[in-house]
Amino acid sequence: MDKIEVRGARTHNLKNINLVIPRDKLIVITGLSGSGKSSLAFDTLYAEGQRRYVESLSAYARQFLSLMEKPDVDHIEGLSPAISIEQKSTSHNPRSTVGTITEIHDYLRLLFARVGEP
C-alpha cells in the first residue's frame, strides 16, 4: 500500500473533503488560517491512527490509556497505527505553527543538521 486515502472528512473546518496522501514520504500540509490543516493532521489522521493503535492493545493495557474520539470521516484506507513523540497543550501565541507546537520543527532541524550537506 503506497497511499493513504481519505474520503468524506468532516472534522471541524473540513467540509466533506477527499484526498490521497503518499505514504513513506515527508508531507507538508499548507493553507490559509482556518482552512483545516490541523483538523486534517491531528483531529482526523492522527486521531484515527492513534485510535487504531489503542484498539490493537490488550484490554488490560487499554484501561490505562484514553481513547480519542473517532473522527467524522466516511473512510480512511492505508493508515498505520500512530503514536505521538510528545504532546503538549497548544499555546496562545499567534506566531505558533503546527511545527513549533508539536516540536517537529526541532526534530527536523536536528535531522537536517546531521544528514544535510552545506
UniProtKB/Swiss-Prot annotation:
A GO MF annotation of the entry reads:
ATP binding
Protein's organism:
Proteus mirabilis
State the taxonomy lineage: Bacteria, Pseudomonadati, Pseudomonadota, Gammaproteobacteria, Enterobacterales
Specify the protein name: UvrABC system protein A
Q: Where does ATP bind?
A: G31, L32, S33, G34, S35, G36, K37, S38
Q: Which residues form a coiled coil?
A: none
Q: Listed GO cellular component terms?
A: cytoplasm
Keywords, A to Z, come to: ATP-binding, Cytoplasm, DNA damage, DNA excision, DNA repair, DNA-binding, Excision nuclease, Nucleotide-binding, Repeat, SOS response
Gene encoding this polypeptide?
uvrA
Function, as annotated: The UvrABC repair system catalyzes the recognition and processing of DNA lesions. UvrA is an ATPase and a DNA-binding protein. A damage recognition complex composed of 2 UvrA and 2 UvrB subunits scans DNA for abnormalities. When the presence of a lesion has been verified by UvrB, the UvrA molecules dissociate.
